[in-house]
Amino acid sequence: MRMADHFEETTMGTFLADYYLWTKSLHVISVLAWMAGLFYLPRLFVYHAEVVKAGTETDALFQTMERRLLRAIMNPAMIATWIFGLLLVFTPGIVDWSMLWPWTKAACVLAMTGFHMWLAARRRDFAAGANRHKGRTYRMMNELPTLLMLVIVFSAVAKWNYWGF
């Protein structure tokens, strides 16, 4: 008996299958919250880098907004996205790892998580008064989550099995 077959027969496999639509809904909600933060934080960095002088009252305001966005919205949303996503992966019959789509989605989710970590490091730079990037860098980096999102959505919805779609 394959391990996957055994998992499908377990109580956990049955539980995940029974609550699949709830898990999927919570996954989509957390992804939306995470993506909102991934789109907004680089925008804050653009204005922080281009307009705000370090050590000013406005600098402190931007640092507060950036910290709260990251800690209160983005971090919990990323964690929830991962938890609900992994629950979906372990739901029997949902992911066929012999196809291409779960691998492209997984690679892009890892890249999105890496981008999140990069943003967290840049927030620490601003907090230390040590930002070394121009607004243009943050403007360009702001496009990365959009590109990753496109690949993730097409992977998860179209479930392609080869690069010719």
UniProtKB/Swiss-Prot annotation:
GO BP term, example: protoporphyrinogen IX biosynthetic process
Xref: NCBIfam families: protoporphyrinogen oxidase HemJ
Reported function: Catalyzes the oxidation of protoporphyrinogen IX to protoporphyrin IX. Is involved in the biosynthesis of tetrapyrrole molecules like heme and chlorophyll. Does not use oxygen or artificial electron acceptors such as menadione or benzoquinone.
GO cellular component, one term: plasma membrane
Keywords from the UniProt entry: Cell membrane, Heme, Iron, Membrane, Metal-binding, Oxidoreductase, Transmembrane, Transmembrane helix
Pfam families in alphabetical order: UPF0093
Co-factor requirement: heme b
Catalytic reactions of this protein: protoporphyrinogen IX + 3 A = protoporphyrin IX + 3 AH2
GO MF terms, alphabetically ordered: metal ion binding; protoporphyrinogen oxidase activity
Pathway: Porphyrin-containing compound metabolism; protoporphyrin-IX biosynthesis; protoporphyrin-IX from protoporphyrinogen-IX: step 1/1
The protein's assembly and partners: Homodimer.
Transmembrane segments: 26-46, 77-97, 99-119, 145-165
Keyword Protease applies: no
Cofactor: binding details: Binds 1 heme b (iron(II)-protoporphyrin IX) group per subunit.
Protein name in the entry: Protoporphyrinogen IX oxidase
Binding positions for heme per the UniProt entry: H27, K105
Compartments in which it is found: Cell membrane
Record has Transmembrane as a keyword: yes
Family: Belongs to the HemJ family.
